[in-house]
């Protein structure tokens, strides 16, 4: 049996990307419904969003489509969360 390692590795990348990207969706939905971001750390949100951005840049530089696609999708979830968290923190002060 011949296994195409490039294909297998790409499939693993897409599965991992799907799981990690959509893992944040319930948090986004909950936060938007409740209009409450107090259960999320500002430091975490900023660090995580920065990390996603750096992963996207890395994926672009390496021309790695799973990394590019899933970090764009993740940023689509986390940029609004970041905005809402910063807005809520500014309202508190």
Curated annotation (Swiss-Prot):
Domain of life: Archaea
InterPro entries cross-referenced by the UniProt entry: PQ-loop_rpt, SemiSWEET
Pfam families listed in its UniProt record: PQ-loop
GO MF annotation terms: sugar transmembrane transporter activity
A cellular-component GO term for this protein: plasma membrane
Keyword Membrane attributed: yes
Membrane topology (UniProt): Multi-pass membrane protein
Alphabetic keyword roster: Cell membrane, Membrane, Transmembrane, Transmembrane helix
Protein name: Uncharacterized protein MJ0110
Species of provenance: Methanocaldococcus jannaschii (strain ATCC 43067 / DSM 2661 / JAL-1 / JCM 10045 / NBRC 100440)
Taxonomic lineage from the root: Archaea, Methanobacteriati, Methanobacteriota, Methanomada group, Methanococci
């Amino acid at each position: 049996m011949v296994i195409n390692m490039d294909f297998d590795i790409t499939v693993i990348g897409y599965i991992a990307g799907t799981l990690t990207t959509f893992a944040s969706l319930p948090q986004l939905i909950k936060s938007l419904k409740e209009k409450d971001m107090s259960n999320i750390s500002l430091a975490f949100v900023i660090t995580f969003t920065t990390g996603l951005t750096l992963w996207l840049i890395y994926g672009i530089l390496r021309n790695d489509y799973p990394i590019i696609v899933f970090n764009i999708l993740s940023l689509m979830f986390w940029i609004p969360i970041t905005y809402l968290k910063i807005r809520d923190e500014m309202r508190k002060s």
